[in-house]
Amino acid sequence: RKQINIGIAVALDWGLIVPVIRHADDLSLSGITRALNDLAARARAKKLSPEEVQEGTFTITNPGVFGSLMGTPIINQPQVAIMGVGAIEKRPKVMTGADGEDTIAIRTCAYFSLSFDHRVIDGAVADQFLAFVKKTIETFPETGL
């Protein structure tokens, strides 16, 4: 069985560090949140062990935290992919109303980007993954938080 170890990019005054949430696929959303908060806090306090920044398989980075709408992250080898999350903003969007007519609505939006190793992941599969992320975020119940 393959491990899913998610790297979380943490910006520090002296550079960037990527602690790893090990076996993320075995954790609940709240478990991932706890692990992320713990690793980020210890990264900022310079209290990570070398093992906690190794063996990531996929990284999530957030250039949006600095106000950037999007970025094109580079894969940290030997990982297979990295996803960038841009700034979350309210934007006008064309929506289809209940009557079937187009209407303008204000929606919370963000751009996501995915860089991946084509030797490991087919482009169509990567695109399907991003579509899945989009659908999951758009339909995630607020009570699920």
Where do the language-model regions lie?
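C-terminal catalytic/motor cores of large multi-domain enzyme assemblies
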Residues: R1-L145
